[in-house]
From Swiss-Prot:
It holds the Pfam family VASt. The chain crosses the membrane at residues 452-472. Residues 1-103, 516-639 form the C2 domain. This is C2 and GRAM domain-containing protein At5g50170. Residues 168-177 have a biased composition (Basic residues). The keyword Repeat applies. It comes from Arabidopsis thaliana. PROSITE patterns: C2, VAST. Residues 206-223 have a biased composition (Polar residues). Residues 253-426, 855-1018 form the VASt domain. It is found in: Membrane. One of its GO terms (cellular component) is membrane. Its main location: membrane.
Amino acid sequence: MRLYVYILQAKDLPAKETFAKLHVGRHKSKTRVARDTSSPIWNEEFVFRISDVDEGDDVVVSILHHEQQDHQSIVSTGLIGKVRIPLTSVAAEENQTLLPTWFVIEKPSDGKFVNIECGKILLSLSLQGKWESTSGEKVLNDKQDIINLEGVKELEGSPKDLISSRDGKRRKHHDGKHIMKNIVNHIDKLFHKKEEISKRLHDESSVGQSVNSNYEDATDQCSSSATCTGFEEGLDLMQSSDSEREEMPENLTGGVLVDQKYLVSPCELNKFLFTPSSQFRKELAELQGLSDVQEGPWTMMQEDTPRLTRVVTYMRAATKMVKAVKATENQVYRKASGKQFAVFVSVSTPDVPYGNTFKIELLYKILPETEPTAGGEASRLIISWGIQFSQSTIMKGMIEGGARQGLKESFEQFSNLLAKTYKTLDPAVVLDKEQVIATVQSEPKTDLKSAFLYFWSSSVICAVLLSVYVVVHMLHCEPSKIQGFEFYGLDLPDSFGELFSSGILVLLLERVYIMTVHFVQARLHRGRDQGVKANGKGWILTIALIKGTNLASVEATELFDPYVVFTCNGKTRTSSVKLQAQDPQWNEVIEFDAMEEPPSVLDVEVFDFDGPFDQGASLGHAEINFLKHTADELADLSVALVGNHAQASQSKLQLRIFLENKNGVETMKDYLSKVEKEVGKKLNIRSPQKNSAFQKLFGLPHEEFLLKEYTCYLKRKLPVQGKLFLSARIVAFYSNVFGHKTKFYFLWEDIDDIQVLPPTFASLGSPLLLIILKKNRGLDAKHGAKSQDDEGRLSFYFQSFVSFDATSRTIMALWKTRTLSVDHRAQIVEEDQDVADPFLLPEAVTVVSDADALMMSKVYTCDLPCDVELVMKIFGGGELERKIMEKSGCLSYASTTWESKKPGVYERRLSYKYNHYVSVFGGGVTCAQQKSPAPNDEGWILNEIVALHDVPFGDHFRVHIRYEVKKAGVDCKTSKCEVYLKIRWLKTIKFEQRISKSIMEKFRNRFKVIFDLFQKESVANSSLTLL
């Protein structure tokens, strides 16, 4: 036998987040969670296989309340009530079918719903034998049609009433199969039968309760909650009730699967995707291998806000891991305003492993595209996903990963198929630079029109009228006689009235004169940067200044003449002056010359024009960070101005900004080449995968590229281990320690100073790199700073680098390169042009600290029968040094002269090649040497950094050498030389131990050869001196 249980709906429940749980013997199942409603509609079917109908077997339907505690799990908070139906009562019905009946939910014995009316639930049950295996589906269809079309009168009563009336008091109904086939012919019989049932139940009730059985009430209840309606009619109904008051739902937590713009209106795209029997859905099902696709009709849920809903079922094709499974989609319109649509889809797959523990959620959002397009109306489709777990499981991570991968592959096919029908719009197509510029410049204002608007004021009109009036008066009057203190050529006022009139006329004419001069100056100041094309190749910044709104002057009563100054990478561009305009309309295009590296910040400031030599009062300013805006956002940006009066007036500027690279990959290579000269170290271009991960981690635009990354500790109250990232425009840090994430970045331009602090006990013997930001800069990274000084400067401490010296030098060099002024950069380029440096060392020379010296190994020591000054001639750069080095196997030996960097400290550089006796690979060598007096003037200490080129793994390490040449005897005629050596690894390799051993042996032998040659050459020179 098979038991079919249909849980249709409930009403008047005391909670809004509910679901029904079904128990039949040892079998259990449950419905989906109905959200935000106390009258849920489930319309779900459950089938159980039972061996026999016993007296003690009951069907128990429990209604439970669920509460969502976080984004991933849902925990039940209490039992609302139960309904218990004996199977024997169902078997005693005609055709063993209990038609849809309202049951009163029994109150629980404990919990928070004990003394509350728990509502009612509409159920239908049917028992089918093996010979009627296909009748279950027919019964379900019968019940749904009865609910929607005919219905039954509400049967109000507890299950106990049903038990007491099961002997000889059964309700008589027509067979559902005949109702489905002949529903129209049997309407009268059905109503007649219902009246007989109602009368008989009223007369024969053994417990004295009045039990009604008219299914029309049930029909009314169901119809008020779910009404069959057409798709377009339902959308019109939702649109009429939407009234733009419902907000568009946020994207689901799992992430965005599709975010694409299409050249089609939102309404047409919505119909194309969700209309019944959509051809697109059929083609997609065929492409994805779906079968037995059954789309239910769109029905209207009559809640506080009417919502269209339907159920779609299909079979997913079998894969290598999972067999063919049935999936059920519940699609609900969350918003339909005519221009914006949101469809929420809940997908249940109970047949997959752990399928009863989770449901996949999808959210389709269709939005109108506000940007101008060349092809007409456009829309944006965003599809996000999430997963809801009804119970916890240890396979949660694996389920999420599998769902993410499967959805990604499915919606790639979805996007590709949709793109065959509607043209997709790239961001560059949506807002094409040339098109926008052409639009901005299409309606330029003439000077005549600007002059008319400027001079059309009361003061100018009064001055003109009064001047005309005086001139006409003069033409009609005879010349006055000379009297008083007048003389020929001087006519004075003869009364106070004449004096007053003359004064007014003079003041008005003065005002007109000042306005005229101001207008001429503004015209001369106009557009000196407007329309000037950018020069060179590199990063081109183009700004279309559209308009300003609600600009406020320092003096509220005065009119002002605004103009805008743009500053980027030390260069400025100025717009034209708009005379006496609170809402100026510029429509101007300004371009900056090509830049070698992408700019970080654009400073915008609005001034009140006050003559050609004065800057004027500021009306507001703003800073646009290119790293915090996408290309789409920059293409249509409304900038809020900052300032006392600007913020109070909500002043804004509308800009369209385009940043593009005119030189392609060569721009990046040129930038790296310039940085390498400053850093003194080879910088490799990172892989696209690393660059993409870096951009995604910090939300950076695609043009930002990674230069270096280092593992280190960020020092705060407790050190935090993470990675320090260096890119062309930012310094970034990221850490994830047991799920606690620390992430921030700041601009190179925000750095005020970088200091290297000596090791301390608190830093575990590691030097500290201190980065201090400028005042009130980098406030977004404040949570990563260790302290903030009295001036408002943030301090960041980094420690425990693998190679502290190389890291600190690289960071210092990048900072200096980025913060150099434009003129200084040009000067450096001119000086370095066409100059090759054979002594270029991958790292700059540095003093080996005492702490580093303690870690160096002594590889050679010798006593020399000569004083310290003679020994130091080995490094003197003279003929003796050249002979020794050539005989020891150095070819093309060249050295610079010793230069004093600071008192007592001298530096020089060397360049040579090894012959094949010294190294089978040959290879070049560059060295940097630094010498300084030893303590107490006992001799000299010379530090040397050696870089090997054109040898295997030569770029993975550097050799640090320290020579200590000191006095050995009391008479100062003998000396002692000790040589220490250390290998500093820049990159980790498996052959470190082998290479270190080889270098130690080679250099030990080399030092012996050099000092033996020195003793021979010194003895020979002494003999020649004696002769």
